[in-house]
Amino acid sequence: MLLINRHKIYRQFFILILTSIISAQDFNIARIQYSGGGDWYADPSSLPNLIDFISDKTNIKIENSEYKIKLTSESLYGHTFLYLTGHGNIRFSDEEIGALRNHLLKGAFLHADDNYGMH
């Protein structure tokens, strides 16, 4: 008698469907611009390198350009992968904190790179 692990089958099916959905959509990365502390523009080669890696190693269709976005911009919600970097103490206004929190709660992803100094 063949025993089938339903959970394993469901998990594999979910991964297959999720991969198909992600690879069918255009994907981009947006660098967060901020004015409080730090330097949001640090390490300018980091995102092009990440974009090249994703493009070379996966089937994800990623846009070959870096977007720069302010947390208070309406266009924030068009970007689901956010990138934050800088040196020093980064500070956000209450409005920026609220916007970032809401966006993350709606499913966005934040990649924070300490760039050797974020606290």
Please report, for each region that a protein language model flagged, where it lies by residue.
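Short alpha-beta junction capping motif
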Residues: 29, 81-119
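Acidic/proline-rich low-complexity IDRs
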Residues: 1-2, 15-17, 46
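Low-complexity, compositionally biased segments
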Residues: 8-10, 116-117
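Aromatic-Pro/Gly-enriched surface loop or interdomain linker
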Residues: 24-81, 85-88
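Sec-dependent N-terminal signal peptides
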Residues: 10-21
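N-terminal secretory signal peptides that target proteins for export/translocation
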Residues: 1-9
